[in-house]
Amino acid sequence: MLIDWILKNIMDMDQEDQSGKTQWTKYYLTVYFSGLFNFLMILILSVLFGTLSETFIVYVVLIFLRPVAGGWHAKTKWLCRLESIVIYVAIPFVLKNSSVSLPFIYKILLICLLVVLFYWYAPQGTAIEPVQPSDLNVLKKQSLIRVCLLILCSLFVKEKIASVILYGLVIQGLMILPVTKNLIEGSVFMKFGKKIIKNVIEKRVAKVSDGVGTKPRLNQNSPNIFGQWMGQTEKPKKNIEK
């Protein structure tokens, strides 16, 4: 692993050392390289899909707001990468190739809603990065100032760019809403994904066990979709009790 190699050969640290300095160095390197990987992945995808300018604008908006407004984080690296692709590439791609635009009155309503949302919920801390009570008012003021600056910028640029700026504001707004916490962190996907996978496996196991004691045909009820190329696995001798 690259991080372990750096710790051993560059930082001259023992990987098994549990001291604070070693653990914090490892934590820093893990966060740094994870962020670098995500950045390069998004950069490559934005070039491939032709959304480099839109992706850059969204990235700047979130980098500008997130340090003061806070917000939820995905609980796993893979979910973080998936959400990053959707936020930085997929939706900007749709915005770029869409001819639909919000009427002026709806934009005004959206802007007012965003200001209220940031006033009410920013800054939003997490279990890992809680907001200190002494910093609450300062961060709230900074959040509102930065939101207003971005809104002001959106009034003096082209329609497409303004739409992307507002989109970035909406995304950051969703990241601080309490109702979106489970969605962004991935708890919703984990809950329903676990349930779906469990049901599928249970049905397959029940189907396989029903054929025990009979002469099976080639790959009949095989749990392995690649069974005819990868060989067969011996089935249990007893049926599962119903």
From Swiss-Prot:
Transmembrane feature ranges: 29-49, 52-72, 78-95, 100-120, 160-180
InterPro entries, sorted: AgrB
Name assigned to this protein: Protein FsrB
Membrane topology, from the record: Multi-pass membrane protein
GO molecular function terms listed in the Swiss-Prot or TrEMBL record: peptidase activity
Pfam families per the UniProt record, alphabetical: AgrB
Keywords tagged on the record: Cell membrane, Hydrolase, Membrane, Protease, Quorum sensing, Transmembrane, Transmembrane helix, Virulence
Species of origin: Enterococcus faecalis (strain ATCC 47077 / OG1RF)
Family that this chain belongs to: Belongs to the AgrB family.
GO biological process: proteolysis; quorum sensing
GO cellular component terms given for this protein: plasma membrane
Function: May be involved in the proteolytic processing of a quorum sensing system signal molecule precursor required for the regulation of the virulence genes for gelatinase (gelE) and a serine protease (sprE).
Annotated localization: Cell membrane
